[in-house]
Amino acid sequence: MSKTHLTEQKFSDFALHPAVIEALEKKGFHNCTPIQALALPLTLEGRDVAGQAQTGTGKTMAFLTSTFHYLLSHPAIADRQVNQPRALIMAPTRELAVQIHADAEPLAQATGLKLGLAYGGDGYDKQLKVLESGVDILIGTTGRLIDYAKQNHINLGAIQVVVLDEADRMYDLGFIKDIRWLFRRMPPATQRLNMLFSATLSYRVRELAFEQMNNAEYVEVEPEQKTGHRIKEELFYPSNEEKMRLLQTLLEEEWPDRAIIFANTKHRCEDIWGHLAADGHRVGLLTGDVAQKKRLRILDEFTRGDLDILVATDVAARGLHIPAVTHVFNYDLPDDCEDYVHRIGRTGRAGASGNSISLACEEYALNLPAIETYIGHSIPVSKYNPDALMTDLPKPLRLTRARPGNGPRRNGPPRNRRRSG
């Protein structure tokens, strides 16, 4: 983590449980990020927090540190049953739930608190086996949590800490009724520590905080600009016919260490994957149609560096903590202005620099004015020479004929740069 992203406030300055301090220091966390420095003084006093901060600013560690400290500092409810977790962390997507669980594991190992994970699409019996042995902190998506609760595999009557992560995304995905269903089965808000974190604290998110929290304190960390000042943004205007060749030419020119390419539909993502895989790139595909086990494997391979490029729909745009993403390509400009911010927020995280390259084609260029109004600035435009675009391209692979991530990255150095002056 870049030192420029940190405050002078140290975790050791707070009266945190010694086991929590030890776990943080083992992971190299000594100084707080701004959102952590704002939230921890409140949660350590037992006050509810609704926090707004740009992605990649340490929200996850803020609520995990608070959760572990609270459980270690407060006894469990009397007569607590084995199917009653003490803390519940809700996330909008299974990928985010898995990531939060991974971030929590070092704290769990240091403190002895048991973790559980519940998400749909895969692993029902495996997840249930862990829950049946009893967990202290349950992390999951609302659908699977409700499923387990209705079958009495879990009971929320002993909950002492609740975290709602990416609350605005919960609304976007239509999960608000599920959230309220789960809250109704917990002790009253006055008997819990409640935390809500979101990229935006819109009216509807504040309304949820008012309903389900106990006089929450609002803390906000506003970036200098919505897109982050460490992200270099660039925009091209290709024709529909030249769009794919421009992307492949830019990949050869930029030669990114780790890139995510976003498109608006799964079919477009599959087409991009086919072109890049045929051209020898180590590329993975992440859409809603990819089986859950394969999704997790692809994310793991991308995180480890076994894949250089991930082609994704917006299912991957929120909550994923993938380190060292150097480039984000918007193959399609998104229809939702907020998705532009969330997409390019995959790069330039935690004080690092990043690059965002967007293609404003004939189909999606109309989305640009609203995006620029939302982010508060114009995206710098670059020109290219159509005659210099790559032409020696193989026929794209079909998804049914190959699996994402197969094949080595092209051997040899990147080709010469082809942009016009």
From Swiss-Prot:
Motif DEAD box, residue numbers? 165-168
Q: Could you mention a single GO BP entry for this protein? A: RNA catabolic process
Where does this protein reside within or beyond the cell? Answer: Cytoplasm
* Molecular function as annotated in GO: ATP binding; ATP hydrolysis activity; RNA binding; RNA helicase activity
In which domain of life is the source organism classified?
Bacteria
Q: Where is the Helicase C-terminal domain?
A: 245-390
Region Disordered, as annotated, extends over: 396-421
Motif span (Q motif)?
A: 9-37
Which top class of enzyme applies to this chain?
hydrolase
- Bias category Low complexity: which stretches? 403-414
Q: What is this protein called?
A: ATP-dependent RNA helicase RhlB
Please name the source species.
Klebsiella pneumoniae (strain 342)
